[in-house]
Amino acid sequence: MSIFEDTAPRAVRHEPLRVAVLGASGSVGMQTLDVCRHFPQKVQVVALAVRSSAEFAVKAANEFNCKYVAFADASVKGNVLLDALPQDCKASFGPEAVQALAVLDEVDCVVNAVVGEAGIYAGLAAVKAGKVLAYANKESIVVGGDLLMPLVKPGQLIPVDSEHSAIFQCLIGENPADIQRIWLTCSGGPFFGYSREQLKHVSADDALAHPTWKMGAKITIDCATLMNKGLELIEAHHLFDTPMDKLEVLVHRQSRIHSMVEFVDGSVKAQLGASDMRLPIQFALSYPHRWPAIAKPVEWQETAPLTGDYADEKTFGCLALARHAGTVGGTLPCIMNAANEVANHAFRRGRCSFLDIEHIVAETMNASEVQRVEDLQQLTLVDAEARALARSFVG
């Protein structure tokens, strides 16, 4: 099912919009709070969740006068810093506490910025509870798309990834049957134009130097391998109910075109703007309306010529692996995602090389049995088995 089964935007919304920000201390979470900071009359941060940062949570809870704070790491309980939470703010602990925020009666919209597979549970809980889900947790769709998407009602799920937000905006008012191709753009990462021989020698510090976007470490490495773009292909496949062979990747070094949709009549709609994650976050919170810009607008007369190149799936094999996983479907995307998280982490810790990431993921995929997706418990088991297998390939 596509999120564009019905293109009519939701007409009724609570104002101020009552928001729960999950993964609030991460890159997307902090930028979400910054958007909320600029629109205090339109957005109320009711709840926030972090992994373990008591200092950050206390500061944010006081700034936004939050009623609820959750810590995924239960060991934070008893931290003396929590004494400084607002008097009427309730703190809770453990993974279940994060999920509980997604179903609060006082919450209209859940911003799911939790990194990794853990965000699936909160995303499913939010959708089942009828909340609007502004999601930046691509793993929710890549791993659990077969479970999540049949539950999503039109207008309920708004993508926060810049590429999928762009596609979403291009498709408003359009008939999904008229889509010829969807083009997801990417900067090419820090190693655009490198050969396989050159990639043998790059370090984690090299890979973390993204040319355009300010993001967390895990996703920045994924951008360097182009696995991030591969995950986004699978996302688009689920979100817009589009076959994998109608999804293309365009390397666009200027990062001004965030994605494009080509229609059967040959026309193309593109969404352009500044390279600022606050733009898609703001759109997700304001939809179906638009709020005044807080990001610096693009000075088009000063912009370099806009260029595009096909992505090199032979040099950057993770992109080809993701396309294969999305085409096969079933539990293979879950297996791929789990192996990638293990390999990504190992690379950042100096335990494997850059090209080893691709090899670890490929070996794990090849050694795993692909099943039809049945339920979340099955995916949890598949994820755990794939991680254990991937760790064995790290050595």
Segments and roles (model prediction):
Residues M1-G395:
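Catalytic, metal-anchored helix/loop core of enzyme active sites in primary metabolism
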